[in-house]
């Protein structure tokens, strides 16, 4: 029986990588073709008879595989010609990929669920006032409102970077997918980015001709974001200051956004019933977020001596506290809709909060079934942020 020895060539150019850069297993590439029934004969460089074949493996193939090999060789040559003929496209794609990857890393770094929360506050408060005063709408106003988001997002981004820089060891246990832990971004780059972000927010705040009060609030917010994570102050290591800062950030941001909204629209700052309701509701919700954010971090916090309410109560008890307080918040909201129909739109108040309460009960049950593991606990925390966004959406129409 006629046999042919076919070896896999290994040139300086690694063709199987060029043809498929994501192929982690070269044995599956075109250059490692093996007939399903063909045995592989191991050989060393010393024993191999040809000086041109550099691999240690060669395949003993029957003549009936000749057509497959020829077809394979043509495919390799065609792929090689295509690769060699498009160096500029590779360069362009490489630059574009790096930019996209850096943007994605920054997005992960600034905690997407918090960014969405900041945007929901601004859009909810601004949207309600504009909804009730449609005659004030203008594209110039919308453009100004868009730029007003920059200081808010800058403050959040700065605080997130500081927190992750000084929590790298803890996050290796609690959140190994974060950019600084996984190595997607270096600590040096994170520091440079934090300075750029803080200065950008300050410049935009001044350029918007904001009142001195708002400039002071922004500067204080940057200081609070720094003091929250950076030793020796590190407010987050003390349960009371950790709790107080978290609540203050939510309530203070709502107050600041409402004040900026009324100022931009030329409206007086009035404590209307709806605004009083959302401030009270978000004060309670800020408490639940302050508690819930530590449930998934219990293991890492306990290992590094960070004392939180969650580490003292445990994941199960902490989850019931969070869910219980939030359910009470929803029941009070439903009661307000029933008692004061002349002030609030009762149908929206009752129905929306009943639906959100049901969703909360369902998610609490799902976490219990998952035995309060770290990953499901983190998903539960992000679900509470979904409830946060939803409340500001409901606020527009109550």
From Swiss-Prot:
Transit peptide feature, positions: 1-77
Membrane-topology annotation of the record: Multi-pass membrane protein
Root EC class: transferase
GO cellular component, one term: chloroplast membrane
Catalytic activity reported: olivetolate + (2E)-geranyl diphosphate = cannabigerolate + diphosphate
EC number: 2.5.1.102
GO terms for biological process, alphabetical: cannabinoid biosynthetic process; terpenoid biosynthetic process
Cofactor(s) demanded: Mg(2+)
Superkingdom: Eukaryota
Temperature dependence: Optimum temperature is 30 degrees Celsius.
pH-related activity note: Optimum pH is 7.
Gene Ontology molecular function: any one: transferase activity, transferring alkyl or aryl (other than methyl) groups
Transmembrane segments: 141-161, 186-206, 213-233, 251-271, 273-293, 320-340, 342-362, 378-398
Annotated compartments: Plastid, Chloroplast membrane
Tissue expression profile of the protein: Expressed in young expanding leaves.
Pathway annotation: Secondary metabolite biosynthesis; terpenoid biosynthesis
Keywords: Chloroplast, Membrane, Plastid, Transferase, Transit peptide, Transmembrane, Transmembrane helix
InterPro entries reported for this sequence: UbiA_prenyltransferase, UbiA_sf
Function per UniProt: Aromatic prenyltransferase involved in the biosynthesis of cannabinoids-related terpenophenolic natural products, which have pharmacological activity. Catalyzes the transfer of geranyl diphosphate (GDP, GPP) to olivetolate to produce cannabigerolate (CBGA).
Similarity comment text for this entry: Belongs to the UbiA prenyltransferase family.
Protein name: Geranylpyrophosphate:olivetolate geranyltransferase, chloroplastic
Species name: Cannabis sativa (Hemp)
């Amino acid at each position: 029986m006629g046999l042919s020895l076919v070896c896999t060539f290994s040139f300086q150019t690694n063709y199987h990588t060029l043809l498929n850069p994501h192929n982690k297993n070269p044995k599956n590439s075109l250059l490692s073709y093996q007939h399903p029934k063909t045995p592989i004969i191991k050989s060393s460089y010393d024993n191999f008879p040809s000086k041109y074949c550099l691999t240690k493996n060669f395949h003993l193939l029957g003549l009936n595989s000749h057509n497959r090999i020829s077809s394979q060789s043509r495919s390799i040559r065609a792929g090689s010609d295509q690769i060699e003929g498009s160096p500029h496209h590779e360069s362009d794609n490489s630059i574009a990929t790096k930019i996209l990857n850096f943007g994605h890393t920054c997005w992960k770094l600034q905690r997407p669920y918090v960014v969405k929360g900041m945007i929901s506050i601004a859009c909810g408060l601004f949207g309600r006032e504009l909804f009730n005063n449609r005659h004030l709408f203008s594209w110039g106003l919308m453009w100004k409102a868009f730029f007003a988001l920059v200081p808010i997002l800058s403050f959040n981004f700065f605080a997130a970077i500081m927190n992750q820089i000084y929590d790298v060891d803890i996050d290796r246990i609690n959140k190994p997918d974060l950019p600084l832990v996984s190595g997607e971004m270096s600590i040096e780059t994170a520091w440079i980015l934090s300075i750029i972000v803080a200065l950008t927010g300050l410049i935009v705040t001044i350029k918007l001709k904001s009142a001195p009060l708002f400039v002071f609030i922004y500067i204080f917010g940057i200081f609070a974001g720094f003091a929250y994570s950076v030793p020796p102050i590190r407010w987050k290591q003390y349960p009371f200051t950790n709790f107080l800062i978290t609540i203050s950030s939510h309530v203070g941001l709502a107050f600041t956004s409402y004040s900026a909204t009324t100022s931009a629209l030329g409206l007086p700052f009035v404590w209307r019933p709806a605004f009083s309701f959302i401030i009270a509701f978000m004060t309670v919700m800020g408490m639940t977020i302050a508690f819930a954010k530590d449930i998934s971090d219990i293991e890492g916090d306990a290992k590094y001596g960070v004392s939180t309410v969650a580490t003292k109560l445990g994941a199960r008890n902490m989850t019931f506290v969070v869910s219980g307080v939030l359910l009470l918040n929803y029941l009070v909201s439903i009661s307000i809709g029933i008692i004061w129909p002349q002030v609030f739109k009762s149908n929206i108040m009752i129905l929306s909060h009943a639906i959100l309460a049901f969703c909360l009960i369902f998610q609490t049950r799902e976490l219990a079934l998952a035995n309060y593991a770290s990953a499901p606990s983190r998903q539960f925390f992000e679900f509470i942020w979904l409830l946060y966004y939803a409340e500001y959406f409901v606020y527009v129409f109550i």
